[in-house]
Design a protein with these regions (language model features):
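Hydrophobic residues in well-ordered beta-strands that form the structural core
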Residues: 19, 102-104, 178
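Short glycine- and Lys/Arg-enriched binding-loop motifs that mark or flank ligand-binding interfaces
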Residues: 11, 44, 102, 131, ...
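Asp-based, Mg2+/Mn2+-dependent phosphohydrolase catalytic module
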Residues: 1-6, 99, 108-222
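Residue-level marker of regulatory loop/turn positions in helix-turn-helix DNA-binding domains and
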Residues: 84, 103, 134
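Short linear interaction motif-like sites in intrinsically disordered regions of transcription factors
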Residues: 29-32, 101, 194
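N-terminal helical cap/lid subdomain that shapes the substrate entry/recognition surface
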Residues: 2-96, 107-109, 120
Length: 222
């Protein structure tokens, strides 16, 4: 078990709160087939990245800006319910209001739709692809989330599942817990890892005039 202290927690969305990995990969398969492109380069880099950066990396010969304007994610589920990652509903219920945010590489429309379909609350601070000029692995989404929560970046803990997101959190000066839904622990280089949010628990919640709110987070290597 590892113990962390932080003022706020910032979650990635896909693969961390919502079990949407299958839909993300299906979208890229459909798009690659429609362009006559091999899918493997896209699957290697799509997790944790915006569509813009994914296309730039996997198909550098294309005009990524023009392509992403026509890239409209559509889940194969057709609006049906999505599963939350195990432990996500319980963990979010135990966190104080205003102590957590979501920072995702998806658009706001996709993010809010997936949260609703998974039965999860939409946080007061939700940072999405269109909110930043640079997507992950640049730290912009996490820095913006910290600002929205009113805490300094070094007092935030990030929960991620993808190398690009972990690199972004590191660049923002934040600690990182990895959920191994899309990558193996050795691929991630996080401060701690767990197979699902069932392994993450809120311990003590303290409040004082000097530091403000302080959360204790316990992470079990499940």
């Amino acid at each position: 078990m590892k113990r962390f202290e932080c003022s706020a927690i910032v979650f990635d969305l896909d693969g961390v709160l919502v079990d949407s990995t299958e839909y993300v990969e299906q979208q890229w398969r459909r798009w690659a087939v429609s362009k006559g492109l091999p899918i493997e380069p896209f699957l290697r880099v799509c997790h944790g990245r915006r569509a813009l950066e994914t296309i730039r990396l996997a198909a550098p010969h294309l005009n990524a800006e023009a392509e992403v304007a026509a890239f409209v994610p559509e889940d194969e589920a057709g609006g049906q319910a999505l599963r939350p990652v195990e432990g996500a509903p319980r963990l979010l219920e135990t966190l104080p209001v205003g102590s957590w945010a979501v920072a995702t590489s998806g658009t706001r429309a996709v993010a809010t739709d997936r949260l609703r379909r998974a039965g999860l609350p939409i946080p007061g601070v939700l940072v999405c692809a269109e909110d930043v000029l640079r997507g992950k692995p640049s730290p912009d989404v996490y820095l913006l989330a910290a600002a929205g929560l009113g805490v300094v970046p070094t007092e935030c803990l990030v929960v991620e599942d993808a190398p690009a997101g972990i690199e972004a959190a590191r660049a923002a000066g934040m600690g990182v817990v990895a959920v191994t839904t899309t990558h193996r622990p050795e691929e991630l280089g996080a401060d701690a890892w767990t197979t699902s949010l069932a392994g993450v628990h809120v311990g003590r919640i303290a409040q004082n005039a000097r530091q403000g709110r302080m959360l204790e987070l316990l992470v079990l290597d499940l």
